[in-house]
């Protein structure tokens, strides 16, 4: 039986909730076809976030890791293609850190690509009625920081990993200026992501790019 670690960030930026954390609470010990989901909570703090996930990886010894964070402004679940080696925080993280144009890993590669079948994920969720599309930018805040840091840690290991952004919850989008997604749909989507990941190592050859 395969084990999938799904991680969720704590609230940040003045929000009382984070849909990533709310989703992983529901997903803990969820059974998959041929697998099980384990979870962990991640601080929205530079470097501490990476350490928390590494600790969980070493404790659970998963086959795959899916790190998850919220993305205000996105209407779909978005598996990320690439993490870049730069921290450029528009706001401070929960530890008060606000690096500008600093590398995450000194002398590290410029970027790491997801090792998950991101296009197959997008295709499968879309066919299941859950909005999903590939994203080509994970930003430069703690989500990208974690994505890059975990990929760096796993660079010589057989554990596959990728980052997935999810929309805000309806209760976070009351101003009417941001799209949202119900927690039930987010949970269903992430469970399906996990199933795709354990079922498929290779991706489908379809367009997932954007003009700009």
Swiss-Prot record:
<dbReference type="InterPro" id="IPR033694">
    <property type="entry name" value="PGPEP1_Cys_AS"/>
</dbReference>
<feature type="active site">
    <location>
        <position position="80"/>
    </location>
</feature>
<comment type="similarity">
    <text>Belongs to the peptidase C15 family.</text>
</comment>
<protein>
    <recommendedName>
        <fullName>Pyrrolidone-carboxylate peptidase</fullName>
        <ecNumber>3.4.19.3</ecNumber>
    </recommendedName>
</protein>
<dbReference type="Pfam" id="PF01470">
    <property type="entry name" value="Peptidase_C15"/>
</dbReference>
<dbReference type="InterPro" id="IPR036440">
    <property type="entry name" value="Peptidase_C15-like_sf"/>
</dbReference>
<keyword id="KW-0788">Thiol protease</keyword>
<dbReference type="InterPro" id="IPR016125">
    <property type="entry name" value="Peptidase_C15-like"/>
</dbReference>
<dbReference type="InterPro" id="IPR033693">
    <property type="entry name" value="PGPEP1_Glu_AS"/>
</dbReference>
<comment type="function">
    <text>Removes 5-oxoproline from various penultimate amino acid residues except L-proline.</text>
</comment>
<dbReference type="GO" id="GO:0005829">
    <property type="term" value="C:cytosol"/>
</dbReference>
<keyword id="KW-0378">Hydrolase</keyword>
<feature type="active site">
    <location>
        <position position="143"/>
    </location>
</feature>
<comment type="subunit">
    <text>Homotetramer.</text>
</comment>
<dbReference type="GO" id="GO:0006508">
    <property type="term" value="P:proteolysis"/>
</dbReference>
<dbReference type="InterPro" id="IPR000816">
    <property type="entry name" value="Peptidase_C15"/>
</dbReference>
<keyword id="KW-0963">Cytoplasm</keyword>
<dbReference type="InterPro" id="IPR029762">
    <property type="entry name" value="PGP-I_bact-type"/>
</dbReference>
<dbReference type="GO" id="GO:0016920">
    <property type="term" value="F:pyroglutamyl-peptidase activity"/>
</dbReference>
<feature type="active site">
    <location>
        <position position="165"/>
    </location>
</feature>
<keyword id="KW-0645">Protease</keyword>
């Amino acid at each position: 039986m395969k084990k999938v670690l799904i991680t969720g960030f704590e609230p940040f930026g003045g929000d009382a909730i984070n849909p990533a954390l709310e989703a992983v609470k529901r997903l803990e010990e969820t059974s998959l076809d041929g697998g099980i989901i384990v979870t962990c909570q991640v601080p929205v703090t530079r470097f501490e976030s990476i350490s928390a996930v590494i600790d969980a990886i070493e404790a659970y010894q998963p086959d795959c890791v899916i790190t998850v964070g919220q993305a205000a402004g996105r209407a779909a679940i978005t598996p990320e293609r690439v993490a870049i080696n730069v921290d450029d925080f528009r706001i401070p993280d929960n530890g008060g850190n606000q690096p500008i144009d600093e590398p995450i890993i000194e002398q590290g590669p410029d970027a790491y690509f997801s090792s998950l079948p991101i296009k197959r994920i997008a295709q499968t969720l879309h066919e299941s009625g859950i909005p999903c599309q590939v994203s080509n930018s994970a930003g430069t805040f703690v989500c990208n920081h974690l994505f890059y840091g975990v990929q760096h840690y796993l660079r010589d290991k057989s554990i596959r990993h990728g980052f997935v952004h999810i929309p805000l919850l309806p209760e976070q989008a009351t101003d009417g200026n941001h799209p949202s997604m119900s927690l039930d749909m987010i949970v269903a989507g992430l469970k399906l992501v996990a199933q795709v990941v354990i079922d498929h190592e290779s991706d489908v050859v379809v367009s997932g790019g954007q003009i700009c």
